[in-house]
A protein has these predicted regions:
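S-adenosylmethionine
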Residues: 1-418
Length: 418
């Protein structure tokens, strides 16, 4: 199949059928005889079209009000290749797009031409600095921009948007069971130290996944929030650890970098995908000391037979960290679900709190920047549970050196003799 047609089909699956970006690429490359040298080009074009989707959608639909999905996606391919990728045959891209247009419609090549000559993508009638302008410029839903602007102010909201438009830094967790920080940095100059022990930033030029330190299992990608959260919490496996998570995550990576053996752990996966992700991770590392259940927040009490010393809660959230990581996440984000998510986060915390022993710890982590899901949830919890005290909380912004959009809170339950 021709690369421009394949790119169109992949985009159609993502935009129209709501197939996730990575899965759509995987399916296309598996089921189609695509030359290896063409795959990076197709991936880049699809990603680029998604990264500029909101403004391109506006321009295409303004020029072609009655265009159907096939024509719209074909124009996305032609537009993205002409302006950014420039690797596919542009005449073939234009011809494919034009085949879906009406006779009276402007030709695809004529539609694209002004932008090749310097015409700005954001329409002139959009006020510079307005929410719509920022949405088109940074490919972010207006609802998210308004929320950040209200919660953090214009300057911080703009910094978040600018950071999200750039690739996320590669933050790594050093496996200190295998190598000390000092030896690691002495042996591998492609990594930069962090103020937090056991954490590094990849600054090498080659692909991180192909680095010898990765192949040896000495380091793995992991957001800084995991390490700092667990540093603040008191995890004593002999006294019990419980985990409730509603999405696939890398918490086990952090635990494996700390403990030689993982035992006496109850892991409740709130979704099937989290359950499978966890089971696969346990099999990969041959871990036997973790019991895994597929259970929602209401079932926590049935999975944890007695109070534990530490309970880590990782409920679903708006997951706005993914705006920087996944080019198609903005298509799936729905701000109307925010109240439902917050109610569920509170439910998970309340249920877990009942299973924390006196003097124990309750840890909360979400991968999003949203005050209502961050400090808002924690403050409401503390009002209802005076027996808990906030030890530390921290919000991570993507414009910081080690990046990421995360929030964690560490709470301690009052002991009987406190």
């Amino acid at each position: 199949m021709a690369t421009h047609i394949l790119a169109k089909d992949i985009l159609q699956k993502i935009i129209i059928e709501n197939v996730p970006f990575s899965l759509a690429l995987k399916q296309a490359f598996k089921n189609d005889s695509v030359a290896k040298e063409d795959r990076p080009i197709v991936s880049a074009l699809v990603g680029c079209a998604l990264r500029h989707y909101l403004v391109m959608e506006r321009l295409i639909k303004d020029a072609y009000p009655d265009i159907e999905s096939d024509g719209f996606v074909a124009l996305l391919v032609a537009f993205s290749n002409a302006l950014f990728i420039k690797k596919l045959n542009q005449d073939e891209c234009n011809e494919l797009a034009s085949s879906f247009l009406k006779e009276e419609d402007i030709k695809a090549s004529d539609f694209i031409a002004p932008y090749l000559e310097g015409k700005k993508l954001v329409p002139e009638e959009i006020e510079v600095g307005s929410f719509d302008f920022l949405s088109y410029r940074y490919n972010t839903p207006v609802s998210v921009i308004k929320m950040w602007n209200k919660q953090f102010g214009h300057v911080t909201a703009s910094r978040i948007l600018r950071a999200n438009s750039k690739p996320a830094p590669t933050v790594l967790r050093i496996n200190n069971n295998f190598i000390s920080d000092e030896d690691f940095f002495n042996q591998y100059p492609d990594f930069e130290k962090c103020d937090v022990s056991g954490v590094a930033l990849y600054i090498g030029e080659g692909r991180f996944k192909n680095h010898p330190a990765v192949e040896k299992g000495l380091v793995v990608a992991l957001p800084l929030a995991y390490k700092e959260m667990v540093d603040e919490g008191d995890i004593d496996l002999l006294r019990g650890l419980a985990i409730y998570a509603e999405y696939p995550n890398d918490l086990l990576t952090e635990l494996l970098a700390r403990f030689n053996n993982l035992n006496n752990i109850e892991f409740m996966a709130g979704t099937y995908s989290a359950f499978i992700n966890t089971k696969n991770a346990l099999n990969k590392h041959a871990i036997k000391g973790i019991n895994v259940y597929e259970a929602n927040a209401s079932s926590i009490i049935t999975c944890v037979s007695k109070p534990v010393h530490t309970f880590i809660v990782m409920p679903d959230s708006s997951r706005l960290n993914l705006l920087q990581v996944l080019p198609d996440y903005f298509l799936r984000f729905d701000i109307n679900k925010l109240d439902e998510l917050i109610a569920n986060q509170s439910k998970a915390l309340n249920e877990a709190a009942n299973q924390v022993e006196d003097g124990g710890y309750l840890l909360y982590l979400v991968d999003t920047i949203s005050k209502k899901e961050n400090s808002g949830v924690i403050n409401e919890f503390l009002k209802e549970h005076p027996e808990f005290t906030l030890i530390k909380d921290k919000l991570y912004f993507p414009y910081k050196k080690f990046g990421g959009s995360y929030f964690f809170a560490v709470l301690k339950k009052q002991a009987n003799n406190d």
